[in-house]
Amino acid sequence: MIILHVKVYNLILKTLNKKNQKVRILLNKQLSKYLGIDFGIKKSGVSISDSNKLISFPLETIETKNLLDYIRQISIDENIEIIVIGKPLKLNNEIHGLEEEIVKFIKSLKNYLPNIQVERIDERFTSKISKKIIIKSGIGKKNRRDKLIIDKISASLILESYLIQKNK
């Protein structure tokens, strides 16, 4: 598969006319990416897939109040097709209290970006796994407690789980 830079891709799309709508749709789908979100009340972790939709990469942790604008911009820059948001379930399968806020956020997101599909996936244990990844990576004790790192790695794990499920 050919991997094109987003700016080159956008230029190609602009030059295609209405007669080439099928080519446009195919090109758009092939070069799109997925976004993963570990939603939090104050801060949220964000991750992104490659254009082959096989690998997830932690992006950053941002203030949740700025999340919609951030997603809008990255959706334009990276041609985001699907946003995967973690679903916080307890061990007994009960829904965590944070779910109410996530549902409100998703409603706003769908109004703000109606052409982007939103998917949900169980996010149990992502924070614990993130902490173990950080420990194994050799990051010092002081930086291990940095919630910003944990959130973006958790977002990457959420997206990775979705990609594995989708590519089975």
Task: Kindly give the residue locations of the regions a language model identified.
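Phosphate- and other anionic-substrate recognition elements at nucleic-acid/protein interfaces
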Residues: 12-35, 41-42, 47-168
